[in-house]
């Protein structure tokens, strides 16, 4: 696996010698704007593979995206290869409909240490919950970013990531009450500990997320990519976009239902994805939100 091929895939052309916060931020932002957070393979009858070589081939060579077990695994590898001090961590996603965190460790994230300061780096949460900058591992501190205000809180060795969101404007009244629209201004995202993990720790959940009827990845097809102004998502056959702060403290959220032909075109033009097999969009009871 070639780190230069990775840099080309994410469009990163700047310094690889300065292992500082600015470089870390640039790599994160290049990856999140080049590599979609998506589960389309599952809805094309293909498996989501866990191994690093398979992930590199899928994302770098085939120019696809993936979910956190792939996308953040690749980021972890790249940052380590560059010389950053990295630790793989595992997270428990907050499940809004049941108001609790997942019982299984379903999210992979990365800790990076720079000059004795620890940062959380995550390029694979997707939608409008995606951080645009590394988060300093400090409890109780509001960390404003373009998407929202993020806050990390530590309690008895467990860290909690929350998000404080803006007001939102939805011009298409048909979708004002849609289950695709995030309606909370204060949003719990996930919890995690600082216990080091390996990719093997995620083998069970990699299978579970692809097979369990309780998995949102089984219920709904999803593709999300950050842009310079916000984020675009394809949820089932609905194209959604959120433009951050399009006016003072208000996000613009737009929705459009797509035909089968339009979906193929949008995947290519908006997300840079050309699928090899037939894609069957799915919007079940369990959905992602924008």
From Swiss-Prot:
Q: Which residues carry this modification: N-acetylmethionine?
A: 1
Provide the reaction this enzyme catalyses: an arylamine + acetyl-CoA = an N-acetylarylamine + CoA
Which one Pfam family would you cite for this protein?
Answer: Acetyltransf_2
Q: Keyword set for this entry?
A: Acetylation, Acyltransferase, Cytoplasm, Transferase
Q: GO terms for CC? A: cytoplasm
Q: EC number(s)? A: 2.3.1.5
Which residues carry out catalysis?
68, 107, 122
Q: Which InterPro entries match?
A: Arylamine_N-AcTrfase, Arylamine_NAT_domain_sf, Papain-like_cys_pep_sf
Which superkingdom is the protein from? Answer: Eukaryota
**Residues annotated to bind CoA:** 103, 208
* SUPFAM superfamilies listed in its UniProt record: Cysteine proteinases (SSF54001)
* Family listed: Belongs to the arylamine N-acetyltransferase family.
Supply the name of the protein.
Arylamine N-acetyltransferase 1
Species, as recorded: Rattus norvegicus
